[in-house]
A protein has these predicted regions:
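Catalytic beta-strand/loop cores that center a nucleophilic Ser/Cys/Thr
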Residues: 112-159
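Acyltransferase
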Residues: 172-211
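Acidic di-acidic motifs
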Residues: 8-9
Length: 211
């Protein structure tokens, strides 16, 4: 069982993410972003930085926690705001996205590796954000997924176990969210999560068109 630290960026989605992780067999400790004990990070098998309002600079210790994960090589997954924080840690610029999206679906195309292993491309995902990483600025990270209009939807570090997704894997609007999280749990030392994710799906049906 992977022992996870979930950094809560004061967001209502965090407990849905935790429910997904626990359903896949992991244990999760949820801590608000302003009370994170950075020294304890290496005692966890993985760290998830949750969605939340505002910018990475206003996300408490999230940026510092990601830096600590990089230093200790602790697997880290950033979701939405957490993804943006990961981009900023490695030199990326986060600015206003071309359009604000809240509860909208988009089709993304991904590289089929890491978080996206075993998932079809194109893939339908649920988006809730007004900011995005500028693609030309994330030179220290590999862009793993984009929308058809070029918005960065996924990144990973080329050498460290650090991943980010701009969309919400836990949303019912996202196809294959359980498998994405299971892929990350496998990197955290819990490969049996892949079997636990089998057959689990969102509550609605999808076609390949963005809403």
């Amino acid at each position: 069982m992977a022992k996870l630290l979930v950094i809560d960026n004061y967001d209502s989605f965090v407990y849905t993410l935790v429910d997904y992780l626990r359903l896949l067999g992991a244990s999760a400790t949820v801590v608000r972003n302003d009370v994170v004990d950075l020294a304890s990070i290496s005692s966890y098998d993985g760290v998830l930085a949750s969605p939340g309002p505002g910018t990475p600079a206003k996300a408490g210790a999230t940026v510092a926690a990601i830096e600590q994960c990089a230093q200790t090589k602790t697997p880290m997954l950033g979701v939405c705001l957490g993804h943006q924080a990961l981009a900023e840690v490695f030199g990326g610029v986060v600015s206003h996205a071309p359009t604000l999206v809240h509860g909208k679906t988009s089709v993304i195309r991904h590289n089929g590796r890491g978080l996206f292993e075993g998932l079809p491309s194109p893939l339908t995902v649920g988006r809730y954000h007004s900011l995005a990483a500028e693609p030309d600025t994330v030179r220290e990270l590999v862009i793993t997924a984009r929308t058809d209009d070029g918005i960065v939807m996924g990144v990973e570090h080329s050498e460290l176990p650090l991943w980010g997704v701009q969309f919400h894997p836990e949303s019912v609007l996202t196809q294959g969210g359980h498998r994405m999280l299971a892929n990350w749990l496998a990197a955290c030392g819990q490969p049996e999560a892949l079997e636990a994710a089998r057959g689990k799906a969102p509550l609605i049906r999808f076609d390949e068109r963005a809403s």
